């Protein structure tokens, strides 16, 4: 089921299937990728309790539990419940108490709330992760919104760019195409020009663009030379992934709290970069904002 939230500047739709966006519209223009099974059927999946992938889809935890999780975790494939809806805010909930089968692969009782709040021409997305168990709970959380690119007919993908808040000079780490895991010793030249990342389908011929060393906490998708577009602000997320398919008319700009297993990491979940740990009954919150310019 879909729920709509709107004000005078922006309208969004959120589905109980995956708990996330199916539409972000302003001034009669759709900004969110609408999904195409022949290219990428996703739109804005929520990554939980991992971001990216684990080596052999499995890991151990300090508590001795075996975790078995497919890429990006299970939250994006579950049916969520509407928790609340008001004039400018709605919240979706996924809880292990409603689906005990989730505990077989991730043995940590949890409640995950995705809260969507309209603020003028922006929507603030907050992920609230609560440890409902009696042990420390390791986890990762991240967003994966895909935006239409180009936005208008007659435009080319290469007409667009991502403008970062700051210059990002660090070389980029590389994902191994066959596994999606990260080789930290094999770094590639940063394709940015100053503060901008020119977009082209060739940029994604082999893998996503992974900013594991990142100064910016804000990035804007827009046509070259124009100010209008979509701005993503992601304070609290240490990593940013930029991804598309070579044949896809979209670009995913993904604030992540963690990364796929790296070549210098073992298979203990808490040893992975960016791992968050919630104490029993603790709620950890991470947020990002999508603003239409």
Q: Which residues make up each language-model segment?
A:
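Acidic, contiguous internal or C-terminal segments within carbohydrate-active enzymes
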Residues: 5, 96-98, 102-147, 151
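Active-site pocket scaffolds in enzymes
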Residues: 43, 228-293
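Active-site/ligand-binding surface loops and adjacent short beta/alpha elements
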Residues: 149, 153-234
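Short solvent-exposed loop/turn micro-motifs enriched in small/polar/acidic residues
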Residues: 51-53, 73-78, 107-111, 155, ...
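Hydrophobic residues embedded in beta-strands of well-ordered beta-sheets
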Residues: 3, 21-22, 89-90, 123-125, ...
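Beta-strand-rich N-terminal accessory domains
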Residues: 1-47, 51-62, 66-70, 215-236, ...
């Amino acid at each position: 089921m879909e729920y709509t939230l709107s004000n005078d500047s922006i309208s969004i739709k959120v589905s109980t299937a995956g708990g996330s966006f199916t539409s972000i519209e302003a001034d009669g223009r759709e900004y969110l990728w609408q999904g195409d099974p022949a290219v990428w059927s996703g739109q804005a999946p929520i990554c939980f309790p991992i971001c990216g992938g684990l080596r052999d889809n499995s890991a151990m935890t300090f508590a001795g539990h075996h975790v078995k999780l497919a890429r990006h975790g299970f939250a994006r494939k579950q049916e969520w419940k509407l928790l609340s809806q008001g004039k400018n805010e709605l919240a979706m909930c996924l809880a292990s108490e409603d689906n005990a089968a989730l505990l077989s692969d991730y043995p940590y009782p949890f409640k995950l709330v995705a809260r969507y709040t309209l603020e003028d021409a922006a929507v603030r997305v907050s992920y609230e992760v609560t440890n409902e168990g009696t042990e420390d709970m390791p986890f990762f959380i991240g967003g994966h919104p895909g935006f239409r690119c180009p936005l208008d007919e007659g435009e080319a993908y290469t007409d667009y760019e991502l403008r970062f808040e700051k210059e990002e000079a660090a070389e980029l780490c590389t994902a191994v195409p066959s596994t999606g895991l990260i080789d930290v010793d094999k770094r590639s030249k940063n394709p940015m020009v100053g503060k901008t990342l020119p977009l082209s389908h060739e940029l994604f011929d082999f893998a996503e663009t992974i900013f594991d060393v990142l100064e910016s906490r804000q990035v804007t998708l827009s046509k070259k030379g124009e100010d209008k577009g979509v701005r993503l602000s992601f304070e609290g997320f240490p990593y940013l992934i930029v991804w598309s398919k070579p044949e896809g008319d979209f670009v995913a700009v993904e604030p992540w709290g963690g990364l796929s297993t790296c070549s210098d990491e073992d298979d203990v979940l808490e040893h992975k970069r960016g791992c968050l740990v919630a104490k029993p009954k603790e709620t950890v919150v991470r947020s990002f904002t999508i603003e239409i310019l």
